[in-house]
Amino acid sequence: MKRLLILFTALLFLLAALPALAAPAQLTWYGHAAFKVVTPNGKVLLVDPWISNPSNPNAEKDLAALTKVDLIFLTHGHGDHIGDAVEIAKKTGAKLVATFDLQKAMVAYKGFPAKQAERAETGSFGGTISLLDGEVTVLFVPAIHGASMDTPNGPVYAGEPGGFLISVKNGPRIYHTGDTDLFSDMALLKGQVDLMLLCIGDKFTMGPVRAAQAVDMIRPKKAIPMHFGTFPALSGTPEEFKKALRRYGLEFLMYQMKVGETLTWK
């Protein structure tokens, strides 16, 4: 009996010494191009955090709930992608991940805290950076779009538009296209993407047909449409996107998130 007690006690100490099992990564869509990624270790990333966009009925509640954010990613300097970034950064201390020129413009023209926009979190297209002690790796990729930043004195240069391939340790590889048209170098990401978050709204970005062609080039595990329906001009629809995917036999790849939905990656 005494021997069993000793073995049981030793087992308890061993279990206590083991690291806690990490939770699965999660992806939340706030509408438009705004997403939250939670890593298995609980780090919080926001991409193009316009939480208060018109398609989000719970914007006020969602903003209030963002009390812990580690990194804010911005694809370019347009207002519908900067969104609530400055407010969230000031509240949470989140650091800005963006190209060098966009970082500087955010500090100079939008009041983003300079101490939270440092060289460790910046790069340029083709460059890769490791963040959060290796928990997140980021590849900066180009996009085809405008990228000026609005100020009281008119638009200013804020770097070139882009996207991100965000690789989460023990989690998904997420390609956020930013605002873009289809371009041939997308094919270089083939086989490297689990979740593709891609614009389908048309007029200012690729529409459903060209977005489907982008999916055919990359072949992600899931294709999640975004940047549609926020304004009347963004007329592309998920239904049209799915129809266009059907031409390639890829309609099964589409996953349509609802605003406020959280997808768990297993």
Swiss-Prot record:
It comes from the Bacteria. Belongs to the UPF0173 family. This is UPF0173 metal-dependent hydrolase Glov_0171. NCBIfam families: PRK00685.1 (NF001911). It holds the Pfam family Lactamase_B_2. Keywords: Hydrolase. InterPro entries: Metallo-B-lactamas, RibonucZ/Hydroxyglut_hydro, UPF0173, UPF0173_UPF0282_UlaG_hydrolase. SMART domains: Lactamase_B. The keyword Hydrolase applies. GO terms for molecular function: hydrolase activity. CDD domains: metallo-hydrolase-like_MBL-fold.
